[in-house]
Each structure stands twice: as C-alpha cells, then as structure tokens.
Amino acid sequence: VSPIQLNIENETDFELDSEPLQEAARLICGSERPGAPCQIGVLICNDEAMREYNRLYRGHDSATDVLSFDLGAELPKSDAELATPVFCDIIIDINQVERQKGSNSLEQELMEIFIHGLLHGLGFDHIRTGDQKLMKTKEEYYKNKLMRGVQ
C-alpha cells in the first residue's frame, strides 16, 4: 500500500466529510502510481478566493471550479516513473461546484471535481484529443468505482 497523505483545508462553511476524498486519493494514487508516495493538498474556498488564485496562477479574472498544480513535475524522475513521488495541490471553489452540480448532490459534484483535479495533479491533461480521451476514460472509471456510496 502506497503512503498517501491528503491534507484538506476548508476555508468555507461547507461541512466536508473528508473520508470519500481520502478513499478516492487512495484508489487513484494506488492505481496510477502503485507504491509511490503521494502528498496531496486540497483547499476548499469560495468564489472570491478562487478568482484571486485563478488570476494569480492562470491570468484569468474569474472563478473556476478547480485548479490543480503538479508540484512534482520539476522533480527528477526515478528510473521507474510510476514510483516517482506525487506532490500536488488542488484548489476547489465550493460556490462554483454548487452552481454547476445540476442533478448531482453537492457531495457527488465535489467528488467528480476532486477526481478531475487529482488526475491533473498526476499529470493527465485534456488539451490534446488523445490526452482528452484518456483522461475522460480514467475519470469515468474512477467515478464508477467511487460514486456508488456518495449521496
């Protein structure tokens, strides 16, 4: 079992049950980087804070649902790339998650956003068509595995 550390900071009034996110981190990191240490920071914030982060890091003056940072991207890769440690930060705007949840519960939408953000943190992307298909496939796979118990 890989050592996975998930640190969650919630700056909002939203009452967060961290166990589903812990389970998701264990499954995704354990599957994508078996045996690699994973350190994941999650910040749950509001629109105002996200707008600042989005402006600071991406140059966009608006809120967004999630920002992900692969902090290990600059680390030297180990001989077995899958064993390279994972360091990522994920910022989630709970107000935006609420607005876009549609028929999902807030917890379900939060899980979907967390899965998306964590896959980015692991180096997956959806800019190029081939990458987009791979990331979408992985998102669907993990949603199917993890969403059964999320109400």
Question: Which residues does each PLM region occupy?
Answer:
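An acidic/histidine-cluster motif and surrounding catalytic segment
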Residues: 1-111, 119-151
